[in-house]
Curated annotation (Swiss-Prot):
This is Threonylcarbamoyl-AMP synthase. The lineage of its organism: Bacteria, Pseudomonadati, Pseudomonadota, Gammaproteobacteria, Methylococcales. The gene is tsaC. One of its GO terms (biological process) is regulation of translational fidelity. Required for the formation of a threonylcarbamoyl group on adenosine at position 37 (t(6)A37) in tRNAs that read codons beginning with adenine. Catalyzes the conversion of L-threonine, HCO(3)(-)/CO(2) and ATP to give threonylcarbamoyl-AMP (TC-AMP) as the acyladenylate intermediate, with the release of diphosphate. It is found in: Cytoplasm. GO terms for cellular component: cytoplasm. Its EC number is 2.7.7.87. It comes from Methylococcus capsulatus (strain ATCC 33009 / NCIMB 11132 / Bath). One of its GO terms (molecular function) is L-threonylcarbamoyladenylate synthase. It comes from the Bacteria.
Amino acid sequence: MGWISGFRLRLAANALRNGRIVAYPTEAVYGLGCDPFNEDAVRKLLALKRRSQIKGLILIAADVEAVESLVDLARVPLGAEVRAGWPGPTTWLIPPRPGIPDWLRGAHDSLAVRVTAHPVAAALCRVFGGAIVSTSANLSGHRPARTPVRLWRQFPRRAIHFLPGRLGGAVRPTAIFDAMSGRRIR
């Protein structure tokens, strides 16, 4: 997956803490992320992508413990399956813990979460100190960016802090499942 310096990771984590949007490599495409608990940052990210808040957002984390601060896996019928598939390219829809902001869930009763297996994305979450928003780097309705060139064609450089790195080997975006029913959503 390539090596990334601690300095670059700290710069990106500080950008997140300061309400900026960060572009970073994920399993299949470049992602755009921000601090999920900074409402202004989330709104800025949605506006940049021209994405409706109703859709909700995915949060990624470096480990299960970070996800458990957001959702209660013990109450989920498929909790063992969820844990067994992480880290990995599967996102699960899980009822959130009390106090999780509405702007993350959109019009849904669940929160989309994943423990990423991508080394750069996971390292960014670790250095940041928790989960981050992870949405594909593209304008709504356009193809996700798989190269920095495509990223910069869609977004102004001044709007995004870029964390370089190679994409993972996945060809499609991660699968999404409902952890209560097991139903595949995407």
